[in-house]
Amino acid sequence: MGEVQREKVAVIIGPTAVGKTKLSIDLAKALNGEIISGDSMQIYRTMDIGTAKVTQAEMDGIPHYMVDIKNPEDSFSVAEFQERVRKHIREITERGKLPIIVGGTGLYIQSVLFDYQFTDDAGDVIYREQMEKLALERGVEYVHKKLQEVDPESAERIHANNVRRVIRALEIFHTTGEKMSDQIEKQEKELLYDVSLIGLTMDREMLYDRINLRVDLMMEQGLLEEVEGLYNRGIRDCQSIQAIGYKEIYDYFENRASLEDAVSQLKTNSRRYAKRQLTWFRNKMDVTWFDVTDGEKTSEILRYIEGKLQVKSNNSK
């Protein structure tokens, strides 16, 4: 018997504000594709402006998945993302379409593409109970700070009030000596799909200017009112509110910052995040990069995907 043919998947990654959304829709039109969001925050309903969620108009009739699937108060894990996205890949492929994953949440995308197993073994019960006791006696912030010291990446992703996940991350570090956020690295990294992995990049100053402009546009579009709606619903200590664009404006509503300072902090955090995204992708994944400083490279990228995945675009028929 011959080798089982792997499903073909195109993946578009890159920092925030680099132009992934438009490119993905152009590619989906040309390649008979459907889009899966690889963004850990666009899953939340009513959080549209701050997550730069693709609009119905931008979708232009192209089906999108993993958008608006959770309420802001719901928690969401990498394991659930992996399971859902792999199901979408199967279903899109069965319909004779090309799955296109687009987003900037590297760990989530990597968990889908590679043979990454999520373990939830018994761990160290005594240590876990010690941490639970500490959380009760000294507060959740104290335990979260301990996580920040050993695994800042996980601490950034997990809200202090999500005590179970904070302690789980601490427990993994305690028992293995490795960060939960680095677990992927010690597993066999075998690609499960026939993947074309495209990265968009541009001149740093230009990217930072685009990020600053995007934040200004978000404020014009009603980001303040969007966050106020969440705040008035009593949504406080949730995973979703840890997102850049929300935690900064929450500081304004909690009287911890002026609106001007909150917006300034949002710009700073967005620029830092873009820098971290680029570093992560360059260190962790084998990406073919396209520099879009001087404009779109849609035709060039389309030709590359056609060659890599042996698929034909509408343009080449």
From Swiss-Prot:
Its EC number is 2.5.1.75. Monomer. Catalyzes the transfer of a dimethylallyl group onto the adenine at position 37 in tRNAs that read codons beginning with uridine, leading to the formation of N6-(dimethylallyl)adenosine (i(6)A). This is tRNA dimethylallyltransferase. Residues 39-42 are annotated as: Interaction with substrate tRNA. It catalyses: adenosine(37) in tRNA + dimethylallyl diphosphate = N(6)-dimethylallyladenosine(37) in tRNA + diphosphate. It comes from the Bacteria. It holds the Pfam family IPPT. Substrate binds at T16, A17, V18, G19, K20, T21.
